[in-house]
Each structure stands twice: as structure tokens, then as C-alpha cells.
Amino acid sequence: MEAFPWAPRSPRRGRAPPPMALVPSARYVSAPGPAHPQPFSSWNDYLGLATLITKAVDGEPRFGCARGGNGGGGSPPSSSSSSCCSPHTGAGPGALGPALGPPDYDEDDDDDSDEPGSRGRYLGSALELRALELCAGPAEAGLLEERFAELSPFAGRAAAVLLGCAPAAAAAATTTSEATPREERAPAWAAEPRLHAASGAAAARLLKPELQVCVFCRNNKEAMALYTTHILKGPDGRVLCPVLRRYTCPLCGASGDNAHTIKYCPLSKVPPPPARPPPRSARDGPPGKKLR
């Protein structure tokens, strides 16, 4: 978050408020203190917001939605929370909107509003994931897994393992991590897409036929419809190109399966024998010289 220079709201108020810090209770409160020793947790603050708000409304008497409150001890917590959180509910001192809104500073009680416990005392413990006992039993763990299923990239009970909600799974994960070095371990959810991608590419290569190209016809500027229908030579070395098979080498006379051009003819690579010098005679001597 960007920090902007603070400007006093009135000439009377000349000192800046203490620095703010985000804590797992999803509230901006004063700098770290004994009331909020835990670090910021994205699972508690963002992904589990619906669960946390529901549990906070069910268990907080300040909102007027406490279990068994208002003479409705037999009503389930979900009905009370839904009626309290309904947009048609009238605004009042116990409504959820004003309670969860940003704290309103009053110029007359500056000293009281700056205390760390005054702003988050009624939400500090109610919105804690561990304090709400979401993972107390198998039913609660399953409910939490369902809530995080669509938001989490992990499948099955991996979300419960990450949140510490499955003791057996957590113990198994701890044993595996102790037995296997950190460098050799790779999460299954990260390796599985790569395997699928690799297998898909290999299958595509196997199913897609390779394009046949005859280099002889292509180099001779033949049409693409012609040089993409065959190849020059087969695996056994025989010539398969119909154009080259009809060609006859002028040096050795080869054609058909052994057809080739002059450039690749074996006779063209043999150096010609050196020319013999003519026999020396009197006629070959330089003019003007007489032989004795």
C-alpha cells in the first residue's frame, strides 16, 4: 500500500495517528503489540472471508445475532446470520455494516481511539480461524474444504493439510518431508499439468503425419503439390522420386533405383589421369638454335 503524507483534519489536531498494520482479524489496527502477535495470513483475510464473517456474526453478541439471542434459542445459526446480514434489515447500533466499517475518528477522544485494543476488541478473537474452531471435527473440516474447493489450486484434502485441519494428512506430510530431501520433493499439483502437457504434445506428434518433401523437386522449383507427395530416397537407398527415376546420367548411364545427377555421379568424383608430355624431338626445340 502506498504511503501518503498525512495532513491534519483540523488545526486543533496536529499530530499524526500511529502507523497502521494489517492483522489476521481483517482490521487495520495500530502497530504490532501484545494484542495481535500473529503475522498477516492471506487464507484468513481473503479466501476465508465468507466463513469468517458467518462465524463472527453467529458468535458475536454485539451484532444482535448471537446464538439463542432475542428469544430464538431454537433457531439455527444460519437463519440468524442471514437475517442479520440481509440488505433489507434496518440500520441500527447493532447492524453489521457500521460495525465492520472503517473506524470513525472523533476529535474529542483522540487518546481513547489510539489504543490498539479499542478498535479490534470485538472482532479480534471472533474472526480468528483457530479461535472459531473451524477444524474442530471431521464435519467442520469437510465444510471448510468445500468452501475452499473453488478458490484453491489444490485438490482433495490438500487445502485441509495446508490449513492444518487434517491431523492424519498433516502427520503424513510431515513424515514424507522428513524422509525426503527438500530438493527432491515436487508437489503433485505442480508436476501433474507438466506431465499432461508433455503427453499431449507427444500424442499430437504421433498422430500428426510428418510432411513429406522431395528436396530434388523442391530445388528444381517444382510445384508444392508435387514435391510434398513423395520423398527423394527410401530407407533402403532406392530412389523414389518419379522425376529423378526417369533421368539418365550421361557419365555412367544410371537410372531408375540408382538414378542420380552428374554432380553426384561416382565418375565425376574420380580425378582424370594426368596428361603425358609429348616426346622430345628436334622439331620441338627453340627456333634459331642448331643441333650439332
Curated annotation (Swiss-Prot):
Comp. bias intervals (Acidic residues): 104-115
Leader sequence segment: none
Residue segments, region Disordered: 1-41, 68-121, 268-292
Record's keyword terms, sorted: Cytoplasm, Disease variant, Metal-binding, Repressor, RNA-binding, Translation regulation, Zinc, Zinc-finger
Zinc finger (Nanos-type): 213-267
Tissues showing expression: Testis and ovary (at protein level). Predominantly expressed in testis. Specifically expressed during germline development. In adult tissues, it is mainly expressed in spermatogonia, the stem cells of the germline. Also expressed during meiosis in spermatocytes. Not present in late, post-meiotic stage germ cells. Expressed in fetal ovaries, while it is weakly or not expressed in mature postmeiotic oocytes, suggesting that it may be expressed in premeiotic female germ cells. Expressed at high levels only in the E-cadherin deficient cell lines.
GO-annotated molecular function: enzyme activator activity; mRNA binding; translation repressor activity; zinc ion binding
Location(s), subcellular: Cytoplasm, Perinuclear region; Cytoplasm
Start-end of Pro residues biased regions: 269-280
Protein residues bound to Zn(2+) 1: 214, 217, 230, 241
Induction section of the entry: Down-regulated by E-cadherin.
Short sequence motif C2HC 2: positions: 249-265
Motif (C2HC 1): 214-241
Pfam families: zf-nanos
Residue stretches of biased makeup (Basic and acidic residues): 281-292
Domain-level remarks: The Nanos-type zinc finger is composed of two C2HC motifs, each motif binding one molecule of zinc. It is essential for the translation repression activity of the protein. The N-terminal region and C-terminal zinc-finger RNA-binding domain are both necessary for interaction with SNAPIN.
The family this protein is said to belong to: Belongs to the nanos family.
Quaternary structure and partners: Interacts with PUM2, SNAPIN and CTNNB1. Interacts (via N-terminal region) with CTNND1. Interacts with DDX20 (via N-terminal region).
Protein name from the UniProt record: Nanos homolog 1
